[in-house]
Amino acid sequence: IFLKTPRLRGLLALNMAVAAASAMVIVNTVVLVQADFGFSQRSTAIALAFFGVGSMVSALVLPRLLDKMSDRMPMLVGTALLVIGLGLGIFLKDYVTLVVLWALLGVGYSLSQTPSGRLLRRSSTAEDRPALFAAQFALSHSCWLVTYPLAGWVGATWGTQASFIALTVVAALSLVAAVLIWR
């Protein structure tokens, strides 16, 4: 079902973009805040909280948006925000910009990810729904299995700016694939 349904194949592409953005945040926040900017563990927690706040704001607004439009539009807009946020990260120079960027990535993350349950329910019957949710879980985690090591390896080898570049490319290609697949 998953690979035969265009909107679910599009979701798989969006999963890769979401994984790219979350990999940058989860893997490299400590490096950016403590090693690059010289701030404390507390500042690291605050930066991660900004990502969470962005995600929560988006999740709170999303039900009203979904009453007025299909799942596709906010999911694609959210993924575009992830691409933009990762791309802007290439030019990151200070902590204040980082927390604003993390909030933007949180908004994009939630817009991209939150409607996926509705999409899965709409694409399945009661009998195949558990298998479809299990497939989504496995496939989304396989995206993380690629992007988390990529974020760390590129960052450790060539620096966080290179990690931003690599993950921006992954997210952008994933967005293009989603748009082309999910019409």
Positions of predicted regions on the chain:
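Helix-loop junctions at membrane interfaces in 12-TM secondary transporters
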Residues: I90-W102
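A single, central transmembrane helix in multi-pass transporters
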Residues: I1-V61, T160-Q161
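Substrate-agnostic recognition of the 12-TM MFS/MFS-like secondary transporter fold
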Residues: G10-L11, V18-I26, F51, A59, ...
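Structural signature of the two symmetry-related core transmembrane helices
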Residues: M73-L88, I165-V169
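Transmembrane alpha-helix termini and helix-breaking/packing motifs in multi-pass membrane transporters
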Residues: A35-F37, V146-F164
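Helix-to-loop junctions at the C-terminal end of transmembrane segments
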Residues: S58-D71, G155-A156
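Multi-pass alpha-helical transporter architecture, strongest
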Residues: T168-R183
